[in-house]
Design a protein with these regions (language model features):
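Flexible, solvent-exposed loop/hinge segments and secondary-structure transition points
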Residues: 2-231
């Protein structure tokens, strides 16, 4: 005896135009929500970044009690909040309680073991050296790579790291490099952390690259920073 045929579900043909309109609506709504979320969170992100940099600046520039931000664009330095401020490298000048320039802080970044490492470091024009670093962002291996932020022996590298310019003033006299742990012999070398050579090399690379690029221009404009605190 033959089995009765199973009932067939009717196929509903959705017009292509209606489907495209629906997809366009969903895509448009998604894009709007992304933009809205960005606009709502951007001020908070920028404020958190400002606070992090300010805290880091007062750590890496001993004696600094106030700061002013500038934009360095080739041969010119202008206050960052000025209408004439050009695009370029943002620098942070720290001043002591006598309104004297105590040091200059710069941001630097390089690829680490896990992700990009971002730091703030201070340059002291008096000794032409790097006086300290503070990690702003990293995702290095806990207990290994993250030692760059807290290992006392590693941080000693930056008590007076040589950043003098060469005779022409166009670059560093000696490139800042990372060397094997325990083999440091020169003031421009960074004694790496044993077991965290990639993170150590990333710090050396970012300090060297940023200093090579910025310091030749910055040192020619120091007078503008010395006089800014009294304005």
């Amino acid at each position: 005896m033959s089995q009765p045929a199973a009932p067939q579900t009717p196929v509903v043909n959705t017009p292509a135009g209606a489907m495209l309109r629906t997809l366009s609506l969903v895509a448009g709504l998604s894009g709007f929500l992304v933009v809205l979320a960005y606009q709502l969170t951007e001020p908070l992100i920028e404020e958190n970044k400002r606070i992090a940099i300010e805290r880091a600046l007062f750590k890496v520039i001993p004696g600094a009690v106030s700061r002013r931000d500038f934009m360095l664009d080739g041969t010119t330095i202008t206050p960052a909040d000025s209408d004439k401020a050009a695009t370029g490298t943002r620098i942070y000048a720290g001043y002591d309680d006598q309104d004297q320039l105590a040091g200059i802080a710069l941001e630097a970044a390089a690829q680490g073991y896990q992700d990009v490492i971002r730091i703030l470091y201070s340059y002291d024009p008096a000794c032409e050296c790097i006086r300290g670093i503070e990690v702003l962002k990293m995702a290095e291996t806990p207990g290994i790579g993250d030692k760059i932020a807290k290992d006392p022996a590693f941080l000693q590298n930056f008590e007076a790291l040589d950043a003098r310019l060469d005779a022409s003033g166009s670059g560093l006299a000696h490139a800042i490099i990372s060397v094997k742990h325990g083999s440091k012999t020169e003031s421009w070398q960074i004694d790496a952390i044993s077991g965290a050579t990639i993170s150590s090399k990333a710090v050396a690379r970012m300090l060297n690259d940023t200093s090579q690029q910025v310091l030749p221009h910055l040192t020619r404009q120091l007078e503008q920073l010395h006089g800014s605190a009294g304005e």
